[in-house]
Amino acid sequence: MAVKRTGQMSLAEALLGGRAAAGSSPLDRLASLVKWYRFDKLLAGLRDGGAGRLAWPPRMMFKALLLQSLYGLSDRELEEALADRLSFRRFAELGLEEAVPDHTVLNRFRNRLIAQGLLDKLFAELDRQLERAGVMLKHGAMLDATLIEAAAAPRSRGRPSHDPEAEFGGKGGSTFGYKAHVAVDAGSGLIRTVITTPANVGDTTVADALLRGDETVVMADAAYDSKARRARLAAEGKKPRIMRRPNRHHPKLPPRLQRYNGLIARRRAAVETTFATLKNRMKLTRIRYIGLAKASAQILLAAMAFNMRRWAALTG
C-alpha cells in the first residue's frame, strides 16, 4: 500500500538555504529531544488509508496532534496552522510544497488511536524516554485533579445533553464535563499518570490508581485524606504527606497540623503550576469532543505535549 512521502526538501526550501528544513525555535529544540522513531512501531498499524487513497505517515499525524495540544487548536485551526506556519511544518516533517491533511483526516486519525488503544502505549513510550534522559526524578508523587468543561451543553429539564457521559462536578455541581486526575513527579513537575473521569467522580476514588508503585513520598491535599490511606501508604514504605482535614471529633485542626498542612501546600505548588500551564498556555479549558473516550484522548495528548514541553524546559 502506498504511503504519502513527507519531509523531502523542495526547490523552494533549497533556495532558502535550508532555513525551512532546520531551525532553532522552541519547537525545533523539542523535536530534537524526542526519539520519534521509537513511536513508529506503535503507530505502524495505522498506515491503511482506505481503498484508492494514500495513507498519511502515522508519525507525521501523531506529531500534528501534539502540536494541536501544545497550542490548544481545534481540528480546523490545526489544518490551517500546518498550511501556514513554517515551524509547524518542520516539527511535523512536512515539506513547504506538500499538502496537509484536512481536519476530517486529523479527526479520523485521532479516532483510530482511540479505537486501537494506542494512546496509553504512546504515553508509556514517552515516559520511558523521560526516565532514560534522567529528567523523571521520582522523588515523590503529587496528586491532584482539575475540572474541564464538556463540549456539549448540560442536560436541562426535558432535554438530554448531547454528551451523556459528562456529569456535573465541583463546588455546588457548577461544572458540567470531565475531571483530569493526575500524579505529578515531585522532582521534575512531569506528569506520570493521568486518568479522566466524569466530573462527579471524587478525587479520592481514583487516587490509588494514579500511583506507579515506585513512589517514596505521596503528597496530596485534604480531599485525599483518610486514616486508611495513610496507613496503607506507610505499610508500603511510602511517606504519606497528605494534608489533614477536620472531622467531627476535631472540628478545628490544632496548630501543629495547620503548620503541617502549610508545609505540604507549599511543596504541592508545582502541581498547580502544571494545571496553569495546561489551561492557560495550552488552552485545555474545554473538551472539544463528545464522550469519555474522546475526552480522555484529548487530555492524554495534552499530558504528552506538556511533558515534552517540560522536558525542553528542564534541559534548556
Model-derived regions, located:
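C-terminal extensions of enzymes
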Residues: 286-316
